[in-house]
């Protein structure tokens, strides 16, 4: 938990320093003030996500699993795209998606949101430094909802693939420190998916470039959707 503790302290320290700078600087120009406030917002969002992941981890470990119900993937994806849009734009990453209307999973809205947010945020972090993209697709295959999240980033070495869903595991620790993270996101995604009777796998992207995560969730039946 030391990694998680450190990650909690980092945004808190940033918020405090930025706030102190604003309060202690007389006649700070509006543009600088706006930049500082924007940075405070980013750090607050980062802190919120870390806290949310830790709380979800506690619930999963405690066996607290809310009842599942039909969740359309499309609207959740649109919401996550809006939330991550600014982060992606700042990195020059283009997010695109193609979702079948039939992609209705038997889970909870929070489940699907957590899965998409963690996978897409991760893909944006590790996307290519130039002309980066993140592609999300959702369809129905073999009686399951299949979601794929693909990026054109640095990819995951073959020796790391069996371990990426392990708790607190981070591929290339030097690179991980640059982009941040606790090493909990993928573990939480896996536990969430398996808690709904689904599965997740990871592999190389098209032509061996980047990474593709494939999620399989139970399909909500028509009577469940009614």
Language model: regions and residue ranges:
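Short acidic helix/loop segment immediately C-terminal to the autophosphorylated histidine
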Residues: 23-30
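Short alpha-helical segment of the dimerization/phosphotransfer core of two-component systems
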Residues: 42-47
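Conserved catalytic submotifs in the C-terminal HATPase_c
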Residues: 69-70, 89, 94-104
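Short conserved segment of the HATPase_c
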Residues: 156-170
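Conserved glycine-rich
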Residues: 197-199
């Amino acid at each position: 938990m030391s990694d998680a503790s450190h990650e909690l302290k980092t945004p808190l320290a940033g918020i405090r320093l930025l706030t102190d700078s604003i309060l202690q600087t007389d006649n700070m120009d509006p543009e600088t003030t706006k930049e500082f406030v924007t940075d405070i917002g980013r750090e607050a969002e980062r802190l919120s996500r870390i806290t949310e992941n830790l709380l979800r981890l506690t619930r999963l470990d405690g066996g607290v699993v809310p009842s599942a119900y039909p969740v359309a993937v499309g609207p959740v994806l649109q919401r996550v795209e809006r939330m991550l849009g600014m982060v992606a734009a700042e990195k020059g990453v283009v997010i695109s998606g193609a979702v079948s209307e039939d992609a209705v999973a038997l889970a909870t809205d929070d489940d699907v949101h957590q899965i998409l947010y963690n996978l897409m945020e991760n893909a944006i972090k590790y996307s290519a430094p130039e002309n980066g993209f993140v592609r999300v697709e959702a369809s129905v295959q073999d009686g399951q909802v299949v979601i794929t999240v693909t990026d054109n980033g640095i990819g995951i070495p073959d020796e790391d693939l069996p371990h990426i869903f392990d708790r607190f595991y981070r591929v290339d620790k030097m690179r991980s420190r640059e982009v941040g993270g606790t090493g909990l996101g993928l573990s939480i995604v896996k536990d969430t998916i398996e808690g709904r009777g689904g599965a997740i796998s990871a592999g190389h992207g098209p032509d061996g470039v980047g990474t593709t995560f494939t999620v399989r969730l139970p399909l909500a039946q028509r009577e469940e959707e009614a």
